[in-house]
From Swiss-Prot:
GO cellular component: plasma membrane-derived thylakoid membrane; proton-transporting ATP synthase complex
NCBIfam families: ATP_synt_delta, PRK05758.2-2
Protein name according to UniProt: ATP synthase subunit delta
Source domain of life: Bacteria
Record note on quaternary structure: F-type ATPases have 2 components, F(1) - the catalytic core - and F(0) - the membrane proton channel. F(1) has five subunits: alpha(3), beta(3), gamma(1), delta(1), epsilon(1). CF(0) has four main subunits: a(1), b(1), b'(1) and c(10-14). The alpha and beta chains form an alternating ring which encloses part of the gamma chain. F(1) is attached to F(0) by a central stalk formed by the gamma and epsilon chains, while a peripheral stalk is formed by the delta, b and b' chains.
GO molecular function: proton-transporting ATP synthase activity, rotational mechanism
Length: 182
């Protein structure tokens, strides 16, 4: 198991280098879209992540697989960066590098990530309303929603923005009421 501080020491320089490279080349939006694609592919195919993380697989085999999977899908500079991660035996941190890149990208654009949990899926109008309220609350220029469902909430919404949690769920209200009555 790798500690989070060690992972951060490994992940941050690569993510920052990707942001710097993309910015210097005027490719921030391209890299962002490509990194979202890479993260989705790795998440959708656990075998790919296991293959890339395996210390038994040679770097050359990993680079060949990266070439086959991503060559026609992502920018060549980003593909070369993935190959560099493989050469440096850091490809097992690919998911974390992608996440950190997206965090840095949001920070550059003054966009906040709001993790929204509801009992049932939100309509587009509800999502837009939450975006507007979060934008007003945070003074950010944009809001990226990450939605999930939890039927145990019974109703309402829980919004997490960074380390702040806004619990407007029925479950949360019932819990607070029970604490007041106790």
């Amino acid at each position: 198991m790798i500690s989070s501080t060690m992972a951060a020491r490994v992940v941050d320089p690569y993510a920052e280098a990707l942001v710097s490279l993309a910015s210097a080349q005027g490719l921030l939006d391209t890299f962002e879209a490509d990194i979202r694609f890479i993260a989705a592919v790795v998440q959708a195919t656990p075998e790919l992540g296991q293959f890339l993380a395996s210390p038994l697989v040679k770097a050359e085999a990993k680079k060949n697989l990266l070439q086959q999977v991503f060559a026609d899908q992502i920018h060549p500079l980003l593909l070369n960066a993935l190959k560099l991660l493989s050469d440096r035996r850091r490809i097992m941190f690919l998911g974390a590098v992608c996440q950190r890149f997206l965090e840095l990208q949001r920070k550059l654009k003054n966009i906040v990530l709001a993790e929204v949990t509801t009992a049932v899926p939100l309509t587009e109008a509800q999502q837009q309303s939450i975006r507007e309220r979060v934008r007003d609350f945070t003074q950010a220029s944009g809001v990226e929603l990450q939605t999930s469902q939890d039927p145990t909430l019974l109703g309402g919404v829980i919004i997490k923005i960074g380390s702040q949690v806004i619990d407007l769920s029925l479950r949360g209200q019932l819990r607070r009421l029970a604490l007041q009555l106790a």
